[in-house]
Amino acid sequence: MPVAVLTLLVGALLFIGTYTATPYGSTATAQDVRASTLDKAAAATEEARVQLLASYEVTPGTYVDRGFLVDNVLHAGNLGDIHFSLLVPESYDVTRPASLFVTLPAEPGLYYQGAGANLQVEEFAFTAQGYDPNMIVVAPQPNDWTQTSANQVVELTEYLLLAYDIDPERVYLEGYSYGGETLSLVMDTKPQLYRAALHLASQWDGDVEALAAARIPLRISLGDNDEFYSVEAAQRVVGELRALYEAQGLSGEEIDRLVVLDVKPASYFWDPNEQHGGGSPRMARDPEVLGWLFAQ
C-alpha cells in the first residue's frame, strides 16, 4: 500500500477522534452522540479516499470488447504503466458493494502481444460473470510473469478497491500458465488482498510462507501430463503448505479447505494430447474449478 494510503487513513482516524469529545446539549442522548460521531467518521473516511484516489493517474481505455473497456492504463510511477481491461456491470450500484475478479493472462495474452489479446485467447473473464452478474472483472496485461508484474497486480487491485465500492472480502484471483506464475508471486507479496486464489496449469515461483500466514484458500489444478508443468512440482508446493498449516495447529479438515490439489486425468481434456493449451477453455467452463473460487 502506498505511503499516501497510510497517511490519509491515519489522518482520517485522527479526524474521527476529534469528534468523540464534541460537546452536546444536556438533552443529547448517548445514541445521538454515537450517530453524530459515526456520520462524521464516514465523511472523514470518504474525504481521505477521494484525496487518495486523486493521486492516481489513469488513462481510459480506447474501445469496448463485449462489455470490457480495453487498454486502460494506470500510471504507477516506478512500477511503470499498468495496462488492463475492465468490466463494470450496468447493475453496479455504489450503495451495494460488488465483488471483484482479477484474471491473469497466459501467453499469448500479455501486453506486448497486443492490447486486449488476453480477452481473445482466454474465457475466464467471461465465464466468471455467470457466477455473479454484479461482479466487476479486471483483466490486467503485464508484459511478463516476474515480480514487477506481481507488484503491478497488487497496485491495480488496491487502486480498484479505492475507485469502486468493492467488498474487500470478495476479491478473487485466478491465473493460468504464466498467469499462474504471476499469481504465485502475488500470493508471496500481499495475499491478504484476496479471498481465494486459483492457480491453473502452472508452477509456483514464489514462497508459500506469506500465503500460509494469511490462510488464503488456494486451489491448484493441472493435467496429469501437462506439456509444460509437472504434477510433482505442484505436489511439493502443496506439501510445503500443508506442513506449515500443521505447524499452526490446524486440523486436517481445515487444511483440506485451505489447499486443494486437483490433478486432471487425460479423459478430462477434449484432446488428451494437448492438456495445456486445451485446459484453459475446459477449466474456464468447469464449475468445479472456477466455481470453487467464488464459493470461498
Sequence positions of predicted segments:
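C-terminal catalytic histidine-bearing segment of alpha/beta-hydrolase fold enzymes
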Residues: 221, 227, 244-296
